[in-house]
Amino acid sequence: MAQYKFETEVNQLLSLIIHSLYSNKEIFLRELVSNASDALDKLKYLTLSDEAYKQIKFEPRIDICFDDTANTLTVRDTGLGMNEEDLKNNLGTIARSGTKAFLDQLAAADKKDSNLIGQFGVGFYSAFMAASTIDVISKKAGENDVWKWTSDGKGAYDLEKVDDTAFPIIDGVPEGANGTCVILHLNNEDSEYATRWRIEEIIKTYSDHIAFPIYLHFTEKQYDDKGKVKSEASKTEQINDAGAIWQKPKSELKEEDYFNFYKSLSHDSQEPLLYVHTKAEGTQEYTTLFYVPSKAPFDMFHADYRPGVKLFVKRVFITDDEKELLPTYLRFVRGVIDSEDLPLNVSREILQQNRILSNIKNASVKKLLGEFKKLAENDKEKYNKFIAEFNRPLKEGLYSDYEHREELADLVRFKTTSPEVKEDEWTSFADYVSRMKSDQKAIYYITGEDEKTLRQSPHLEVYKQKGFEVLIMPDEIDDIIIPSLGKYKDWELKAANRAGSDKELNTEEETKEAEKKEKDFKPVLEKIKEVLGDKVKEVRFSKRLSDSPSCIVVDETDPSLQMERMMRAMGQFNTSAVKPILEVNADHPLVQKLKDSKDKEFVEDMSNLLLEQALLVESGELKAPVDFVKRLNRLMTNLK
């Protein structure tokens, strides 16, 4: 017997699980049954597609036994099984990037969320919520060696080579069968999980639609009229439906059936926001059952996110690790695709180039987007919940999926300055257009890092003054997505924080008056530019400001300051910094003081402050904050 230490991440996870109170501790059994089902799926696929496994007799079953005297619970499957290396890799480590971020998220949660554990794919460890010690006995299909893994979840595990006699004898399970047996030595306070009624209740709730039979072994007792046991008999009953729910007619299924299958499929304890069940017949036959979770998957913005859709061919599991089954922007969708036409031995390379699967993918995207549209039209409250979780991925689709760009443009939502819409409500492009002024030529929007700051931005002063609505876009990807979209139907999309976007807001008379004022103000602009030098691209007379002394904008062809910061953080911006354009409000008292001043130090300080305060409002940061404070102190000292 050899002892091994858990990796640091496993120790962290076990500590979180064991020392946290979970409101639904019972999910550990769902996780163990789900793991058993996955092992059966994998072996079924190999026996049909891999010559090395075709001689193995596939006899799928999951058996659950309990001993209320010894306080143990056993889950046995006849699936693929694990050898020594598999046990070390699967039960001794968490071989996924993003582990630390996940553990930090779990630890920081106000209410420790067992749902996150299942989503992350480490559900086996949840068994330590109910067990003081766990034994795992496993024999890999096609191999003769049997291995036993044992741990109390306190930092280490034992691993030893045993033989077939280490497996408990279970009625119906062939002697020497491959697969895995998990034996939980339950905590005293968790003895309820060694009772027939509790096990049946959990399986019916979470695992009824597991596609393989689940057998419960128990002792049935007969009592006499005095309450004494007169006879005992060992019994075995199948306690799950064991049907592929997606192959059943919709008329035979209740909402509860769909919800229970979703929980089993996704390891999510919450009900889905939406489900879409489709059966296609004709030149191609396939069935899809898709779900939209109530909450975004924790890894939705990780590069190595886990795909949520499983591919089956004629009810045979093929893969759950193929990111091409749906577009990346629909990575939050969970569900199954079951094709009647794909070959069973389809490889990943064939999958990515397969015309049949490509057609299924395109049809699925149209179906899902159509269902999202129906939800938006028929249930605004539920759609707002959907948008709160998945607006950003949909916006990614505007950039990546040209074919469905129009549909996606009608689905995405934004915050707005419109007085008709509350600040916590969303609006669409179509809603914006319905509120446009009769002579309005464009849809106006503003991008930045923070909604509250954007609502108070100096750039919006002229829009508010003249009653033009502006869409608020604080998402960092908006700076990429919206310019790539360019227009919505017949209306151009214009950024309020870009140079020249305010030109059409003024009447002809106002424009002429501004041009005259600008001409008179030109010496002041030149004075400010001389002070600022190459800190700015240009200093301009502002037609958009009414209350603020200054603001910065960027040229129409330059990336925004937010975009520049994002690209630099990603290592994709190697050129010199984008120089902003400083716009100055000629009517503001501070600017008037600068105009009239002959004090060189005052002119220098005020010119720099006009730029720095505008940068602070725009980005919340300065390159030389100490110099800014010194200038501010000098000016305040000279106040009269």
UniProtKB/Swiss-Prot annotation:
Q: Which domain of life is it from?
A: Bacteria
Q: Which GO terms describe its cellular component?
A: cytoplasm
Do you know which InterPro entries this protein is assigned to?
A: HATPase_C_sf, Heat_shock_protein_90_CS, HSP90_C, Hsp90_fam, Hsp90_N, Ribosomal_Su5_D2-typ_SF
| Listed Pfam families | HATPase_c_3 (PF13589), HSP90 (PF00183)
UniProt main location, coarse: cytoplasm
Molecular function terms from GO: ATP binding; ATP hydrolysis activity; ATP-dependent protein folding chaperone; unfolded protein binding
Regarding protein family, the annotation reads:
Belongs to the heat shock protein 90 family.
In this chain, the stretch annotated as B covers 349-565
Which region ranges are annotated with the description A?
Answer: 1-348
Native organism is: Treponema denticola (strain ATCC 35405 / DSM 14222 / CIP 103919 / JCM 8153 / KCTC 15104)
Protein's UniProt name: Chaperone protein HtpG
